[in-house]
Amino acid sequence: DYLQEAHPEKELPELFPDENITGRDMEEDSFSQYYSSDAPRKRESKKPAFQLKGEKLRQEDMSITEVCIPVKEIHARAKAAGVSITVFLTAALIWAIHEEVPQNQAKKPIGLMIPVNLRNYFPSQSMANFFGWIEISCYFQPDTAFEDILRSVKEQFAKELSKDVIEAKLNDLVSLEKNPILRLVPLEIKTPFLLAGTTLGGRSITAIYSNVGIIRMPEEYRKYIQRFGLFASTDSLQLCSCSFGDEMVLSFSSKIPNGNIERNFVEKLKKEQVSCEIRENDFPGQKEERKAPAKLFESFTFLCIVLAVVCNLIDYLVDGHMGWAWFVTAGAFCTWLMVSVAYVKRRNLLKNEMWQ
């Protein structure tokens, strides 16, 4: 623990003092523990949702925006609307996305994936992943008001968060893993189909919103902590939120760095009498020079081009025609193609060599 190392004289308490929890408890597969082959499953078709468009950043890059709001203000506004904070922020995000929907796609719904902590439904001490999700989808009409979206989101939350629905989804998910036929298929064959299934399943999702909720720390730690924030990697747009004390941090991560949805979201909160402050939009290292692998790849590309040009020039000046230089050019191109595929797929040349 960093704070324990930084302040050894304070003798800060352990954050996980429960000695009754064993290593086996923390490593258990809670999905398999609560899976029942006889339980009902929940499968339903989802209509394709609006998808965010725009030029995306490179694989290793991410646009980051962090917004801080007072817990008291957002709680008061959500309470006045008769909804929870999570429902209110979900509706606000859907509203912000809708403002960017072009007219020719206005009939498509806005779909959000909301991760759900399954520990709230099934007791578990596991440190492994034990999360499910629900999908919230809203259609807009020309006269749709924000209150209509709030009402729709609230109703969907109440339906999707019932234990029966959550349990059915858990069984549906684990049943694929337990399928004896699929378990016999080699991973190399399954991978393309899994990727295709992920793509098809993601058609009903526009963005993701994950609310971690209230973070509580022992009193001895509180004076050393100003706030908490979290981000998640995404292929499109994801909003994460958490609160500590009287401050809630809303963290946007996006592959499409135009910032319009983030702007719309902040403006909507301000219209709802919730003050917002963008604390950080330029994190340390965000404008630093490119990482070494990117520089190395660019230098390698340049050298391949130089090699091909120089060899062709020498061949032409010496022999008066193109001969052996074509073989050098072809070899340089094949080498560049192999390295470029490795770089694009894994962004780590040494790791790719290990895989090969």
PLM regions and their residue ranges:
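Acyl-thioester-dependent acyl-group transfer interface
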Residues: 99-289
